């Protein structure tokens, strides 16, 4: 009897082994490719803001183009101002413009020295705001009527750990979490009053960005920044495309370009201390600061290529999925309480899908 039980157990073990082998062969055809795909989907969802902001930085750094009056240009270390009211068709780089404010936007480099943002006195009845975000899209500072009043002022954004002394007429606003930051300003306008346009344009002309070493001199030069040639070499072929169209093209036609751009952004902006634990896994795929995608084998490259589309699909479907902590009440969507600083709160899908993609 014991022999029969032993034989039965051995036969069962063989059957399980054979079944497991068949199951494994069907599901895992190429472990290297599968690993790159699985890790890549997560990395794509995490790093999407770095990709999108690189696209915008490259596009917005270019000189003005005729017929593109509603697309920011020459907006590095100086403000580009929307000088007239747009329509939904006029802006093609994602999101939807307000219809009662005019925008003032800039990418600013704060990697070595502080910069000073200057805001003039603003009439009491006029709302204005400047949202300031790191390259990962998380807001870290704000200037506006509700927090700073309407008297105007000079506000310094400094590199991390900067220990210098500011002039008496400059107040420190915040430390920049990344060397490259984004400023989006809005100034209230009455769309039904044609005369109000001139008043808002006059205010916009007084919004200034100054390199601290040049503070106090007349007609200071633009603050310096690292060259963007490497980024342009990657993205200039797509300059004619709005950001949503560019994302589709890259995902479908050249997904490894996504990772090249992400690596460029991470080289220049790093990964926050709270997320450093991701880097060892990424390094096995040549993703992250200082990594070299050209050394990848074909299987890893194929897995990473496939992961880009899936990562973007997850972000596109996130808004209406159970993953979204926001709520719908009476037809209105209420965003998650950490909206605007989702990455700081550890909600990376929300950061990518709602803060960046939407």
Model-derived features: where do they sit?
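N-terminal Sec-pathway targeting helices
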Residues: 1-21
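A compositional/structural signature for long, glycine/proline-rich flexible linkers
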Residues: 20-358
